[in-house]
Amino acid sequence: MNVSTTPVFSLHYVGINLKRGIASDRFEDFVRRKGVAIPAYPGWQWTLLRGLRGERENQYLMVYQAKDAATYTRYIDGNGELTDEAHAFWRQRPEAAALIEEWRTFATFAELPTLYTCYSLVAENSRSSLPPGPNYRDQPRQESIQRVIGIHNLALKAGVTPQRFERFITDNIHRVEDYPGWKFHLLKGQSGNRLDQYAVMLIIESLASLNAFHPDLDVSTEQALRFVAEHQDTEHMYDEWKTLASFSGAPQIYTDYLAISGNENHAHPA
């Protein structure tokens, strides 16, 4: 995979301002009504998520996606700080900067010193039926979109090198068959709190699609079991994976999140 042309994902924890007595419903009302007007940098999109289940249930996460590494570093440097071009972007958009200031009265914004990790893409299922586009959209005369994003942190087994694990994934990614409307990504931390650590990111077209296959923590429906039975090579690939590293799902640390807001200027990455 050509790293120079693959997306970059940056994940930032977002916390409610409890000292001001902010309730989550007030924050979510703001981000849906007004926060969506905060633009993304050119070639970027942002999505605000709320934990549905797992480790960070009812907690928030901001996901930035840039179309490639050059587009990411144009605005954020290797230390997670804004570049001169990023500062200029906000100076030229005082209305957007004012919305960010209003956001900060409810919760932290996705910026230092919040916990974050910038991830590169090791591999993805390029044959997924999930179309490119925003993870959240709620606008008149357009189809509503509210995707689910699962983040599953992984760990290598003793004696397994990163090079060996990544080679296995890239050599075998063609064997991965996702559920309809799901898309698998393997990420590797490049900076921030989870440097050099791996995560599986699953983007799912809707909450209904998640529940059609896995309505609860590690619960599989009949539809999911039929899919597995029909795609045995994928299951064999996952068994081989488990000899090298932990796999997505319990007992690993993971959270399924629901998209609750996102930038409405949809010049999103391809």
List the model feature ranges, each with a label:
Residues V36-T47, E55-R56, Q65-C118, R167, ...:
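An amphipathic, aromatic/His-enriched active-site/gating alpha helix that lines ligand/cofactor pockets
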Residues Y254-A270:
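Short, charged interaction patches at domain edges and termini
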Residues M1-S4, L48-G51, N135-Q142, L186-Q190:
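Short beta-strand/turn micro-motifs at beta-sheet edges
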Residues N58-Y60, D196-Y198:
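Residues on conserved beta-strands of the protein kinase catalytic domain
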Residues N17-D29, A155-E166:
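Short, surface-exposed ligand-recognition loops at beta-strand->loop->(often short) alpha-helix junctions
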Residues P7-N17, R147-A155:
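Active-site-flanking beta-strand signature of metal-NTP-handling nucleotidyl enzymes
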Residues T108-N153, H266-P269:
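Surface-exposed beta-loop interaction hotspot
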Residues G15-N17, V63-Q65, A155, M201-I203:
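Short hydrophobic/aromatic beta-strand micro-patches
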